[in-house]
A protein has these predicted regions:
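Active-site helix of classical SDR
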Residues: 155, 190, 198
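Substrate-binding pocket helix/loop in short-chain dehydrogenase/reductase
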Residues: 131-144
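Residue(s) in the substrate-gating loop at a strand-loop-helix junction
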Residues: 176
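Alpha-helical segment proximal to the catalytic Tyr-Lys
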Residues: 160, 164, 203-207
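Non-catalytic terminal and boundary segments that flank Rossmann-like NAD(P)-dependent oxidoreductase
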Residues: 1-40
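Conserved glycine-rich cofactor-binding loop
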Residues: 40, 47-48
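Conserved NAD(P)H cofactor-binding loop of Rossmann-fold oxidoreductase domains
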Residues: 124-129
């Protein structure tokens, strides 16, 4: 016996119980170099490793980028390489532990892009040292201040700027696969904090049209890992 007629009859009865609306969607093709066309992004720790790779992917997608780093020489080198793409690329010396400087540097960033809305923040800057039982207090403070404290206060400055100006955009926090495991180092502890912060920011800023995401890369052949 063919069950299809019975199935169709039951489906028809089921659908008749609900109102059905039809939505027309126009699909369009977007080329790779236009995915982020016209957008402006800040990428911390953008001179090497994952940060530089993100910056390069962004400029290839048409995004204008502002990268930060602690070394002027490495910043200039990264900006020079990224400038071969047809987007605006600028660099700013920024120490993630110097929270007092964030407001002034962010104002300078806005001036550098002629007041264009900056609608993406990538919190990538980070440092790492030895884990327990070899961590010094100085190393602990450096890791937590750079990785977590810096991310917290940059997100606060940037989030307020977006909300105050009605800018809908994105914050991306770079955590680590280690944030999914028990913490036995300052680095892993900082990434646990970033994961929790990401969840909190996502909930707090969603109503303002700001999407907050986190990524948790595993071991990656970056200069920091190879030390």
């Amino acid at each position: 016996m063919n069950p299809l007629p019975t199935i169709k009859k039951k489906l028809k009865l089921l659908l008749n119980r609900f109102s059905v609306s039809y939505v027309k969607i126009d699909l369009m093709s977007v080329t790779q170099n236009e995915l982020l066309k016209g957008r402006y992004a800040i990428i911390t720790g953008g001179t090497s490793g994952i940060g530089y790779a993100i910056a390069e992917a962004f400029v290839k997608s048409g995004c204008n980028v502002i990268i930060t780093g602690r070394s002027k020489g490495r910043l200039d080198n990264a900006v020079s390489k990224l400038s071969r793409y047809n987007t605006k690329t600028v660099g700013f010396v920024l120490d993630n532990t110097n929270v007092a400087s964030f407001g002034l540097v962010f104002t300078q960033m806005q001036d550098a892009v002629n007041g264009q809305p900056i609608d993406i923040l990538v919190n990538n800057a980070g440092v790492n040292f030895k884990g327990m039982p070899y961590t010094t207090e100085e190393e602990y403070d450096s890791v937590l201040d750079t990785n977590l404290k810096g991310t917290f206060f940059l997100s606060q400055v940037f989030g307020k700027y977006m909300v105050d100006n009605g800018i809908k955009g994105n914050i991306l926090n770079v955590a680590s696969a280690s944030s999914l495991r028990p913490a036995n180092s300052a680095y892993t502890l900082s990434k646990w904090g970033i994961r929790g912060l990401t969840l909190g920011l996502a909930k707090a800023l969603a109503k303002d049209g700001i999407t907050v995401n986190g990524i948790a890369p595993g071991p990656t052949a970056t200069p920091m890992l190879m030390k």
